[in-house]
Amino acid sequence: MAGGPSTSALAIAVSEAGGLGFLAAGYKGADAFAEEIRAVRAATDRAFGVNLFVPGIEPADPESLGEYLRRLAPEAERQGAELGEPRFEDDDWAAKLDVVCAEHPAVASFTFGCPDASIVDRLHEADVAAWVTVTNVAEAAAAEAVGADAIVAQGAEAGGHRGGFVADGSGEEGIGLLALLRILARARPLPLVATGGIADGAALAAVLCAGASAGQIGTALMLAPEAGTPDAQRARLAEPGPTRVTRAFTAAPRAGSSTGS
């Protein structure tokens, strides 16, 4: 839950309650990330994890970006806004890996890609388990090949970004969580952590029956008092409505609350 909702207070509260609290490294500098890890460690002796964005290997297609900008132009003009220039960065990838190895949280999970085997080896040397977010069998195979300790199986029900990195023909809508778990349970021997639409005990029981070793909760915790969720987002989440998949803001598919056409 990068971008605000993830806080050290939320990670502490989850771990103290018996879960495995996570800190999101996305959209913040390496120094701020390190400070949050230290704040969690100072407040609890329970295990916790961190999540990192894996930078894209392939450059964005200029033609596709140009078409996207052209489609946005009328709305930008209507709102009196200027379209910015595309920016490409790696979210302080190398520096954040250094932080993880130095601070050694229990788990480092990865989204938008699969770290190299050399990175996984480095994490293991620092006594950090490596989890990789996947949305299909091909991605799970990639995670297994680099030595990942567990697979985070993200179903289409998940809010926020799609964590996939290998196209499998299922489109942006993706595969439902229970179906994905059954597929991966048969295809891959690694432990499965289920995520996507888990908001209560019944949903958690369902994913455990489908082959998961654990369940991961995201959106449901955005209303927790410890979360850094802005008031406008809290109000929107408190009134359930339709969602849609969009590439707005980051160009990566993400599911969010629909605010109009």
Give the role of each language-model region.
Residues 161-193, 198-261:
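Conserved active-site-proximal phosphate/metal-binding subdomains
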Residues 1-187:
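Active-site entrance/lid segments in N-terminal catalytic domains of soluble metabolic enzymes
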